[in-house]
Amino acid sequence: MSKGPGPGGSAASSAPPAATAQVLQAQPEKPQHYTYLKEFRTEQCPLFVQHKCTQHRPYTCFHWHFVNQRRRRSIRRRDGTFNYSPDVYCTKYDEATGLCPEGDECPFLHRTTGDTERRYHLRYYKTGICIHETDSKGNCTKNGLHCAFAHGPHDLRSPVYDIRELQAMEALQNGQTTVEGSIEGQTAGAASHAMIEKILSEEPRWQETAYVLGNYKTEPCKKPPRLCRQGYACPYYHNSKDRRRSPRKHKYRSSPCPNVKHGDEWGDPGKCENGDACQYCHTRTEQQFHPEIYKSTKCNDMQQSGSCPRGPFCAFAHVEQPPLSDDLQPSSTVSSPTQPGPVLYMPSAAGDSVPVSPSSPHAPDLSTLLCRNSNLGSPSNLCGSPPGSIRKPPNLEGIVFPGESGLAPGSYKKAPGFEREDQVGAEYLKNFKCQAKLKPHSLEPRSQEQPLLQPKQDMLGILPVGSPLTSSISSSITSSLAATPPSPAGTSSVPGMNANALPFYPTSDTVESVIESALDDLDLNEFGVAALEKTFDNSTVPHPGSITIGGSLLQSSAPVNIPGSLGSSASFHSASPSPPVSLSSHFLQQPQGHLSQSENTFLGTSASHGSLGLNGMNSSIWEHFASGSFSPGTFPAFLSGPGAAELARLRQELEEANGTIKQWEESWKQAKQACDAWKKEAEEAGERASAAGAECELAREQRDALEGQVKKLQEELERLHSGPDPQALPTFSDLEALSLSTLYSLQKQLRAHLEQVDKAVFHMQSVKCLKCQEQNRAVLPCQHAVLCELCAEGSECPVCQPSRAHTLQS
């Protein structure tokens, strides 16, 4: 979380002693600033009370939800003092409950959630520049919509001072101002620059980009906690969320750690179990200052206001540098009679550029400059990196050419990690062009590789044209040529093409390299190559016009180049299977002293040693085979005798190998079909298992429901048996098992019930008919009410006839 300016380090405009009364007057506030100062988190959210607030998680609501989030409005009284201090915290305030014994009249600062009372105080709100950038909507990427710090000069406001602070400032203004105190009387923008100038004066190396990239926020701040007054200008970390692992000691990617960052919020780095050994970023600082992302995007503050408060500690680019052009020499530096070569501007100790001629004895080695701070030391470092490598292109910031402010390519408004394989390959190609133009390479590395490539050349010379093995070997030799530094060559007549140009992708991960590795495992002695060459040497006589292929001589004259046909670029786009012609006749006119004897043997001819085809092979070889009358895949006419039989056997073995490969492909297809069938059966079995599981779950739920019903019925039955009104008595054996006190209680209950039953019987006898005992009694003509109407019709009154009544009663 960004730190606001400290109590003594906040940006403010100085007030002279005569203007104290004027400063105490109420200053006008912008409408948005006034709204936040007056209403932010001062009232409870009405929607949260109804559980309808949608800004609770994450908590971004303008109003407070809990008491510990409540903020008191800061007010400056008529006497010039604040209603509560903007710096001194209350020791009685409970941060959990949000209650203070002195209530709102407490003269000290309450540490509410987010420290809102201090951040949105009249003294500090929007008086300092935020160190974090803004998103597309203009909101702070760290603190969100309610950021208490200014984003640009237009968002700054002048602080409101307490009368006591003004008096202290007047006292300091009378000649006792220190370096720290001088920051008090500056504007917000000047204060931030003053802080940066202070730290740069203590350690000038912070002005170097490489030093910032390697050391920024990697060491803890030496000042006590919460007493560092430099704020965002401090290059040291103050907590774990601000810490950055040194990229020199720890290797990690530019992607955030999923255990630390959830959504847009960075959590505690301690939640990651891997700790410092994690391969991902743990803090926003680590991600912004990662070597892959650092200075890869333009600074928003520089685009909006033309200045950045973070200065050299900003992770974004401040100066747009022109990209490296294809031709490293601009038009203004073309060689002239008065200017024999390109003029280089070398950085001096004073920081400016000094022109140095390449022929000057003080001119440094250009290859050393090109390879400084990069991996251009060897060709393997250039071409051996596999696709997808996160290594950035070599940096060429050590050389400055006329008309260019720098050679380091600057590209902005791109997502982090935009260095794809194709762009890396393009940068490698540009760097090779730079080396080829500035300093001729030695041919020793290429000549050292000839013994390794010689067996493959011999294999190429004895195999028929158009065979798969021949094309594989030619492709592998192409890869070998591409892996060596480019040799000096004349400018081709075809624009935009270079015979020494590198392949676009590193050659270590191509199909040719795989075949080349397979050929390294072959023993060429098994093919009888030595005997075949011996036969050729004995049966042929070399002459000046003959062509050498892998040490063997072919009785044929050297090819003749047709004038005017070399300027066309049709050979580069030809769709025919014939090999391409040579690139340019300029190669034929080069002195032979440029190439070593081993390289002449490798290229295959002494007359046209510099003429290379598209694939890096000698074009005269292809012209010789193309001029023949045989088709691809047939044997040349010069091959006869035992060598032809041996080649026929080799070709038969190759065909058998191809047939075996086809059989393996068929077997693989059958296995794949069987695997697909098994996979389908497994999916169906899984679906059936899922359906059975669902049915089992349904049956389990039904069983649980029935068990619940049985349990309820048992409880109801027990309640009936043990309740105050038992419906049935236990058996005699059960009574004996009861205790005497329980029996007494049961007897008492039964007697009470018996009395109730007697009363009910007596009542029913008094109202029911004495004869049927079902219908209610009716008044008879004799004025007696003992029988019902039905019984009175068929019988006489039992009262009038006592004997009858006695009979009925009995």
Swiss-Prot record:
Q: Which GO terms describe its biological process?
A: cell morphogenesis involved in neuron differentiation; regulation of translation
**Keyword annotations from UniProtKB, A to Z:** Coiled coil, Cytoplasm, Metal-binding, Phosphoprotein, Repeat, Repressor, RNA-binding, Translation regulation, Zinc, Zinc-finger
Cellular compartment(s) = Cytoplasm
Disulfide bond residue pairs? none
Segments forming RING-type zinc fingers:
766-801
Coiled coil feature spans: 643-723
- Give the ZnF (C3H1-type) ranges: 84-113, 124-154, 215-241, 251-285, 293-321
Q: Which residues carry this modification: Phosphoserine?
A: 240, 374, 378, 385, 631
GO MF entries = mRNA CDS binding; zinc ion binding
Provide the Gene Ontology terms for cellular component. cytoplasm
| Polar residues biased stretches | 586-602
Q: What is this protein called in UniProt?
A: RING finger protein unkempt homolog
Report if keyword Phosphoprotein is assigned: yes
Which residue intervals are annotated with compositional bias (Basic residues) in the record? 241-253
Q: Which InterPro entries match?
A: Unkempt-like (IPR045234), Unkempt_Znf (IPR040594), Znf_CCCH (IPR000571), Znf_CCCH_sf (IPR036855)
- Pfam families recorded: zf-CCCH, zf-CCCH_11, zf-CCCH_UNK, zf-CCCH_UNK-like_4th, zf_CCCH_5
**What does it do?**
Sequence-specific RNA-binding protein which plays an important role in the establishment and maintenance of the early morphology of cortical neurons during embryonic development. Acts as a translation repressor and controls a translationally regulated cell morphology program to ensure proper structuring of the nervous system. Translational control depends on recognition of its binding element within target mRNAs which consists of a mandatory UAG trimer upstream of a U/A-rich motif. Associated with polysomes.
**Family per similarity comment:** Belongs to the unkempt family.
